[in-house]
């Protein structure tokens, strides 16, 4: 019986197999190659890199607009006709796409690091293009439908830019190992210069980025102004259904500065609270009056409005994901809320709470179309609330309002020059936080005009506005913001400059050290680390990438070895690369008939 022994045994390379297998479905040794990556695959790598940065921006955008998720859902509700929480599915999908692209990019960079030829599998190419196209379409849709929300990105950078800069600096510094390794192995000086120039341009740009960073929270602690007052948006809509009596009771319990309410008149002249033009979103009108669900809310008599439930929708749709945290008693109370009269709300808040009133325009055929201002004023004055506590927002009949209630704070929702506002008798502005800059706030304050910004729900945004000097904000999450004792971060300018310069110096030292080490290590490998060669190693070695010059040297040494010594056997051949990867070969101990042949 003849016993056959293998000429060679290659130790398994599990990590390398997983790397090339996941990226290009090349799990076997013979499927891998250290040849140069084709131009087609380089194009796919460029697409992959571009997709990474695009999905990074989109993921950052969607994470930061968490402040406005409810507004986004309400906006889509008005366009689509039904309520659904679109924010979380979009966030989850965006996070999944970003994670997928990031993993592919890391695998591609690992291919470069170990000298493997990149060959992205066709399934990944489909997934990459699907993710890219979906992201582009979604971003374009948001830009067209809600371009105002992109201002949120620039505002958020005031809070995150100093930290994003350090993170980007760490990432680019870490890439120096890969760049330096490629630089050391390149044979053409032109290619080396192009690579180093491009890399250094990125590094220098990052070093200088702090010159463009402007954040109001980079300031001395003693210059920090008072904490902005908090106004509950439609009461406390995270703790109770919006514009209901329970919502305003919860707001008063929070001991906040004021509340905001949306007022409209019923068909028989009773002022009540409702934000939408119809009753579909916040009541069960489709069950009680199915034929009138799309009618304007002002076309219902008060006796009809009293029949509607205004709380079940809150528990069913859970717009702020807070319904599950309600106590048993609050849950039952919320389920039984009804449409709220203006007079009932005023009775709850009249003692120590300010009020911003917003009005809906009535249809022209409404019986009180021309007199609803008078009716509302009578209701407010009859409640006993102090006139100084009322911020009057509608531009309609301002002169009449001044005559009847001269102490009302005349408030405007329009961004105009301070001089024009003063001429109109405006003392307060109520604007969306994306509509004003830090300079606008300071100019208005210098002109003795108070500014209230809406809708501010996140502590980081509240902190930025606090550092800016905003006097008050309107919020859905008053119970959260009232517990913010201090801006999330506040840094003196000298301290920030010290962190900036120190980070740049550390990065520079690491980059220079990496380039020196990689060049020294590569020179040592070329001069003395190559001991013996085997043609099978040249063909099958997949752990490292060697230049054509290195492969030529190995082949020449093998040929001269056979000429000088004849056909010999070797006990063990081992080749280590400059990257630290070993492709070891073990031969049998019985060498009687073993021969190495060159084809």
UniProtKB/Swiss-Prot annotation:
<dbReference type="GO" id="GO:0005886">
    <property type="term" value="C:plasma membrane"/>
</dbReference>
<keyword id="KW-0378">Hydrolase</keyword>
<feature type="transmembrane region" description="Helical">
    <location>
        <begin position="88"/>
        <end position="108"/>
    </location>
</feature>
<dbReference type="GO" id="GO:0006629">
    <property type="term" value="P:lipid metabolic process"/>
</dbReference>
<protein>
    <recommendedName>
        <fullName>Glycerophosphodiester phosphodiesterase domain-containing protein 5</fullName>
        <ecNumber>3.1.4.2</ecNumber>
        <ecNumber>3.1.4.11</ecNumber>
    </recommendedName>
</protein>
<dbReference type="Pfam" id="PF03009">
    <property type="entry name" value="GDPD"/>
</dbReference>
<keyword id="KW-0963">Cytoplasm</keyword>
<feature type="disulfide bond">
    <location>
        <begin position="15"/>
        <end position="18"/>
    </location>
</feature>
<dbReference type="GO" id="GO:0004435">
    <property type="term" value="F:phosphatidylinositol-4,5-bisphosphate phospholipase C activity"/>
</dbReference>
<feature type="transmembrane region" description="Helical">
    <location>
        <begin position="193"/>
        <end position="213"/>
    </location>
</feature>
<feature type="glycosylation site" description="N-linked (GlcNAc...) asparagine">
    <location>
        <position position="336"/>
    </location>
</feature>
<keyword id="KW-0812">Transmembrane</keyword>
<feature type="glycosylation site" description="N-linked (GlcNAc...) asparagine">
    <location>
        <position position="448"/>
    </location>
</feature>
<feature type="transmembrane region" description="Helical">
    <location>
        <begin position="498"/>
        <end position="518"/>
    </location>
</feature>
<feature type="disulfide bond">
    <location>
        <begin position="25"/>
        <end position="576"/>
    </location>
</feature>
<dbReference type="InterPro" id="IPR030395">
    <property type="entry name" value="GP_PDE_dom"/>
</dbReference>
<dbReference type="GO" id="GO:0048471">
    <property type="term" value="C:perinuclear region of cytoplasm"/>
</dbReference>
<dbReference type="GO" id="GO:0008889">
    <property type="term" value="F:glycerophosphodiester phosphodiesterase activity"/>
</dbReference>
<feature type="topological domain" description="Extracellular">
    <location>
        <begin position="214"/>
        <end position="497"/>
    </location>
</feature>
<keyword id="KW-1133">Transmembrane helix</keyword>
<dbReference type="GO" id="GO:0030426">
    <property type="term" value="C:growth cone"/>
</dbReference>
<feature type="glycosylation site" description="N-linked (GlcNAc...) asparagine">
    <location>
        <position position="301"/>
    </location>
</feature>
<feature type="transmembrane region" description="Helical">
    <location>
        <begin position="126"/>
        <end position="146"/>
    </location>
</feature>
<keyword id="KW-1015">Disulfide bond</keyword>
<comment type="function">
    <text>Glycerophosphodiester phosphodiesterase that promotes cell cycle exit and drives spinal motor neuron differentiation. Mediates the cleavage of glycosylphosphatidylinositol (GPI) anchor of target proteins: removes the GPI-anchor of RECK, leading to release RECK from the plasma membrane. May contribute to the osmotic regulation of cellular glycerophosphocholine.</text>
</comment>
<keyword id="KW-0325">Glycoprotein</keyword>
<dbReference type="InterPro" id="IPR017946">
    <property type="entry name" value="PLC-like_Pdiesterase_TIM-brl"/>
</dbReference>
<dbReference type="GO" id="GO:0007399">
    <property type="term" value="P:nervous system development"/>
</dbReference>
<feature type="topological domain" description="Extracellular">
    <location>
        <begin position="64"/>
        <end position="87"/>
    </location>
</feature>
<keyword id="KW-0472">Membrane</keyword>
<feature type="topological domain" description="Cytoplasmic">
    <location>
        <begin position="182"/>
        <end position="192"/>
    </location>
</feature>
<dbReference type="GO" id="GO:0045666">
    <property type="term" value="P:positive regulation of neuron differentiation"/>
</dbReference>
<comment type="subunit">
    <text>Interacts with PRDX1; forms a mixed-disulfide with PRDX1, leading to disrupt intramolecular disulfide bond between Cys-25 and Cys-576.</text>
</comment>
<dbReference type="GO" id="GO:0047389">
    <property type="term" value="F:glycerophosphocholine phosphodiesterase activity"/>
</dbReference>
<feature type="glycosylation site" description="N-linked (GlcNAc...) asparagine">
    <location>
        <position position="352"/>
    </location>
</feature>
<feature type="transmembrane region" description="Helical">
    <location>
        <begin position="161"/>
        <end position="181"/>
    </location>
</feature>
<feature type="topological domain" description="Cytoplasmic">
    <location>
        <begin position="109"/>
        <end position="125"/>
    </location>
</feature>
<keyword id="KW-0966">Cell projection</keyword>
<feature type="transmembrane region" description="Helical">
    <location>
        <begin position="43"/>
        <end position="63"/>
    </location>
</feature>
<feature type="topological domain" description="Cytoplasmic">
    <location>
        <begin position="519"/>
        <end position="599"/>
    </location>
</feature>
<keyword id="KW-0524">Neurogenesis</keyword>
<feature type="glycosylation site" description="N-linked (GlcNAc...) asparagine">
    <location>
        <position position="374"/>
    </location>
</feature>
